[in-house]
Amino acid sequence: MANDKLESLIEAAFEDRAQINASTQGDVRDGVERALLELDSGKLRVAEKQAGATGPDAWKVNQWLKKAVLLSFRLNDMSTIEGGPGGSSWWDKVPSKFAGWTAAEHAAAGFRSVPNCVVRRSAYIAPGVVLMPSFVNLGAYVDTGSMVDTWATVGSCAQIGKNVHLSGGVGIGGVLEPLQANPTIIEDDCFIGARSEIVEGVIIGQGSVVSMGVFISSSTKIIDRATGKIHIGYVPPYSVVVSGNLPGKNLPDGTPGPSLYCAVIVKTVDAQTRSKTGINELLRD
C-alpha cells in the first residue's frame, strides 16, 4: 500500500475511532500495523525536517502517524510482556522493540542497549546510538550517534537528532498524554544537561547546549540576554541556555511580587563549551 493511501486509511479510521476495538480486523488493523512497522524501522517518522529549511517552521509533522500510534491502543488487548526482573512479566498493550530478537537482530540494528533500558515497539533507534538504562516510548526517533543516558526518558513520538547527548534523568516530553499537537524535537549536535525537561512540542535548535536543570515548555519565555528578544517554544541554533527568573509584578499592597521562571540564552556555543559537551567517540565503537 502506498503511503498516501495508508495515510487516508489511518485518517478515516481515526475519525471513526469510537467504533474501533480489539476485535476490529481487516484494512484498519493491517494499516495501523504497517504504520507501526514503518515507524519502528525508521522508514517513516512522525516529524521530518524539510531540506534547506530553518527555524521553528522547518519541521513537517505527519499527524496521521501519531494517529496510527493512538489507534493501536484501541486495537490491542493487554497481554504479558516478558523480561521482567527475576523472571517476572509486565501487563501492557505495547510489546518491547526487542521481543524475539536474537544476537543477529541486535548486531544488524547496530546500536547498544545496556541492560534495563526499555524501548517500546514502533520507536526507531539508529545505528551508533547508546541506550543506558533509559526509556524510549513508542513512535520516537533517535538518530545516529546519540546517547540516551541513565534514567533519561524520550517521550512518545519525540525526535532526537544525530550526535545528541541526553544526560542523566533528562525528560523529553511526549505527545499522547496530555495530547499535544506537535512532538518535542531536539535537533542534531545538542547537549541536554542532567535533569532538564523539554516538553510540549518545544524545538531545541541544532548545536545548542541546555544546562543542568532547565525546564522548557511551550509557554516558557526563553530570553536572549544579548538582544532582549523573547522566544517561545523554540531555542535558536547554537544557544547556551540556563535557568533564570523574570522580576514579578508588584502585589496589590505595592510590595515586590514573586519572580517568574524563565530560560535564558547566555551566549552562543563556543570552543570552550564544545570541549565540555562533545561526543566521546570511544563510547560509540
Curated annotation (Swiss-Prot):
Query: Which key words are in the record?
Result: Acyltransferase, Amino-acid biosynthesis, Cytoplasm, Diaminopimelate biosynthesis, Lysine biosynthesis, Repeat, Transferase
MF terms per GO, please? 2,3,4,5-tetrahydropyridine-2,6-dicarboxylate N-succinyltransferase activity; nucleotidyltransferase activity
From the UniProt record, list the reaction(s) this protein catalyses: (S)-2,3,4,5-tetrahydrodipicolinate + succinyl-CoA + H2O = (S)-2-succinylamino-6-oxoheptanedioate + CoA
Its localization reads: Cytoplasm
Q: Which residues cross the membrane?
A: none
At the top level, the lineage of the source is: Bacteria
What SUPFAM superfamilies does the entry give? Answer: Trimeric LpxA-like enzymes (SSF51161)
Q: What is its EC number?
A: 2.3.1.117
PANTHER family per record: 2,3,4,5-TETRAHYDROPYRIDINE-2,6-DICARBOXYLATE N-SUCCINYLTRANSFERASE, MOLYBDENUM COFACTOR GUANYLYLTRANSFERASE
Q: What is this protein called?
A: 2,3,4,5-tetrahydropyridine-2,6-dicarboxylate N-succinyltransferase
**Organism for this UniProt entry:** Beijerinckia indica subsp. indica (strain ATCC 9039 / DSM 1715 / NCIMB 8712)
Lineage, uppermost ranks: Bacteria, Pseudomonadati, Pseudomonadota, Alphaproteobacteria, Hyphomicrobiales
